[in-house]
Amino acid sequence: MAWDMCNQDSVWTDIECAALVGEDQPLCPDLPELDLSELDVNDLDTDSFLGGLKWCSDQSEIISNQYNNEPSNIFEKIDEENEANLLAVLTETLDSLPVDEDGLPSFDALTDGDVTTENEASPSSMPDGTPPPQEAEEPSLLKKLLLAPANTQLSYNECSGLSTQNHANHNHRIRTNPAVVKTENSWSNKAKSICQQQKPQRRPCSELLKYLTTNDDPPHTKPTETRNSSRDKCTSKKKAHTQSQSQHLQAKPTSLSLPLTPESPNDPKGSPFENKTIERTLSVELSGTAGLTPPTTPPHKANQDNPFRASPKLKPPCKTVVPPPSKKTRYSESSGTHGNNSTKKGPEQSELYAQLSKTSALGGGHEERKARRPSLRLFGDHDYCQSINSKAEILINISQELHDSRQLDSKDAASDWQRQMCSSTDSDQCYLTETSEASRQVSPGSARKQLQDQEIRAELNKHFGHPSQAVFDDEADKTSELRDSDFSNEQFSKLPMFINSGLAMDGLFDDSEDESDKLNSPWDGTQSYSLFDVSPSCSSFNSPCRDSVSPPKSLFSQRPQRMRSRSRSFSQHRSCSRSPYSRSRSRSPGSRSSSRSCYYSESGHCRHRTHRNSPLCARSRSRSPYSRRPRYDSYEEYQHERLKREEYRREYEKRESERAKQRERQRQKAIEERRVIYVGKIRPDTTRTELRDRFEVFGEIEECTVNLRDDGDSYGFITYRYTCDAFAALENGYTLRRSNETDFELYFCGRKQFFKSNYADLDSNSDDFDPASTKSKYDSLDFDSLLKEAQRSLRR
């Protein structure tokens, strides 16, 4: 059906309306036309309007969290937002229409200073206070409604094709009453006189206008660069505006800025609309309104592009294809504008889906920015202090990456022409303008904060290494099948490694004998390879089971192989069925230890980890005196090794017994030869060296021993080399006694050396002996009784 929104010069067709609200969504019949002629400024309630915005801001954060947590219901929720999109379509369409230039100076007076955005400078005023006509800005729809007098019709004469963006919450739908739109000539003198007469009435609504047009960031800087032509000025302002909007999209997922004055494709190149400045954006940023939500830290990065910006007008009208954001998508300053026939927009290309996909996709302005920006923000704003929210979100993001990459393969061909329209000169100029604008936007406080963050991040990277080189294992094991298929070299280089400095590592490396060999083995030279290349190896004998890491060939061609380590050990141990490994990282690539070592290359992006729970690789605690018991491939090998150990033990015991017997034979021989002297009653503090030195005067001593007892009866044995020396010591040994010592007891060994105290001193303790216990019944009888007893026994 045809939908007449303006006059007879521009008519919207079914295809254009379907492109705005969705391919499968019909236009709502309850919004046929709007009649704004009877709208009075006094009927507007600014307090309730601002309160509604605050309520929407509070609800937007909750809904955005729901979208982030429930990505599976994205398409169902997008369909519910289409009704709210109609109001955005009407607002954006009506705002794009030109009005007379006489009413613009009053808006500049109202919005001077407080309302000006950070990326736009207020138009320079003439001496009489009026701005140049080509620099004039058009008021938005709400401005027109607030500033229009009672019973006055607003004038429109043009409308243009638009590309809509979803900016309404699906829980609070906006409904409008049916009305009739009445048009009149926009350049009539009647409209000019009305606008000039109503200037005093615009002042009471200045606070509302400031509230609607002021961005979050304070307008503390203004661009000072003067441009040679209005064409260059228009392009640079659009670029700066796009950059400021990208900051809001980066920090707040629910924020959206709509250009209120998209240029008409029917305007000729020499029309006065070509030289006019871009209209200030009506920031429908419910979550970004100052004072409504807590501030976001750290400062937003200003160097990231906005994938939802409108293309500026550089050439005659042509069709524009808006691809969804993805890792391969590159956005440049397109020369085409929105034509009459806009391409239809599927539900997967809405802003909400794009925002969710943006967190898991990579996009870079290679032609504009000459740099890549990672959009897979796994660590929040600080890469070194925050960890991954949950393992489920990682899996969701990875699956969305693969889904987006498959969809873009068929759509990149249609958008190649858009990337080639901007020449290198324009790109360099845009890049310089964007860089200068971004440098002016940073406030002194935020600059100091960014400097501190960079210093802290540099120190941490210097000590621990870059976060992209850290090890992420748990999600890698679960998602290795997803990465094995659709990752090319470009995608692999853009994909940052999952850093999990504080994440628990369940899948561990196993030990291996040939780990150094596996580290030097090159990868296969295919273009598409898996993120985690599995190449396990298990040794055959006397070696635990290990898995190896195979860095890519390109890494070793660029720099020599260097293995770095992090001094981080984990004290998690396994049960007895598996060895109690302590996880550590080794300094040497070829070092082998009983711990599981996590190796990684300095510039490598690939990590490999598999866990093998094999009975042959199970380690048990050993009872042997060795550090660990070796492993065997077969029972026969185990039996053979056990017999060898038993044989060695028997041989050792046999040798020890032979040595003991030999010493005993030598002692007995020395005793028989009268070469061993027993020395008794020595001091308890006498040492073997002292006793040897004192008795060595009689001859050469082969052996000297001292035995100390608790009761003080200490003694020693001295073995001489010759028998004559032993006899000399036995005869003259008493002369060695000192004045404070008792006389030595000197004997030849063999008589008292094996005596014990209970044997030698049986009668020393007479109290312990009871003679009554040894008496029999006959001891208590007299002689007569004994005689009678004897005779009685004989009679038997």
Curated annotation (Swiss-Prot):
Q: Where is each RRM domain found?
A: 675-751
Q: List the disulfide bonds.
A: none
The known PTMs are summarized as:
Phosphorylation by AMPK in skeletal muscle increases activation of its own promoter. Phosphorylated by CLK2. Heavily acetylated by KAT2A/GCN5 under conditions of high nutrients, leading to inactivation of PPARGC1A. Deacetylated by SIRT1 in low nutrients/high NAD conditions, leading to its activation.
PTM Phosphothreonine: list the residues.
T176
Region of interest: Disordered: 98-138, 211-274, 288-349, 463-487, 541-637, 648-667
A Pfam family the protein falls into: RRM_1
Spans annotated as Mediates interaction with RNF34: 348-796
Q: What is this protein called?
A: Peroxisome proliferator-activated receptor gamma coactivator 1-alpha
